[in-house]
């Protein structure tokens, strides 16, 4: 068994965010992970779920680990600039997403006057 195959097996046994960061050699701030652990793991899981779908041939451990590392970096960076509320990855947050406020530009507003009001105004101008 090659070193990469062993590393891939170890990847499959990881159970904490820190284990993934250490195994894939990704630098991280423990404070960011402490606050966003579940969000990072969820984002990471969604990222790797779509990797190599429909690949005709078996993907090598080297390619898998490289792509897993890139996915973990994307997941981590997503939460260094935004919060869990911004991403809303979990159902409880999706369900409580605020409705966007309606916006109507003033150029879209038209005022229509009833016909009687227009004739009254014309009579007043005389």
From Swiss-Prot:
Belongs to the NifW family. Homotrimer; associates with NifD. Residues 104-126 are annotated as: Disordered. Signal peptide: none annotated. This is Nitrogenase-stabilizing/protective protein NifW. The gene is nifW. May protect the nitrogenase Fe-Mo protein from oxidative damage. It comes from the Bacteria. Pfam families: NifW. Keywords: Nitrogen fixation. GO terms for biological process: nitrogen fixation. It comes from Frankia sp. (strain EuIK1).
């Amino acid at each position: 068994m090659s070193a990469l195959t062993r590393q891939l097996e170890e990847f499959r046994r990881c159970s904490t965010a820190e284990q993934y960061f250490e195994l894939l050699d990704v630098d991280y701030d423990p404070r960011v992970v402490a606050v966003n652990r579940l969000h990072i793991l969820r984002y990471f899981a969604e990222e790797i779920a779509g990797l190599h779908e429909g690949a005709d041939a078996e993907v090598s451990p080297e390619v898998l680990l490289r792509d897993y590392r890139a996915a973990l970096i994307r997941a981590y960076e997503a939460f260094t600039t935004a919060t869990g509320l911004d991403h809303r990855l979990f159902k409880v947050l999706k369900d409580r997403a605020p409705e966007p406020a309606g916006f109507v530009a003033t150029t879209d507003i038209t005022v229509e006057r009833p016909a009687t009001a227009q004739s009254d105004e014309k009579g007043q101008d005389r």
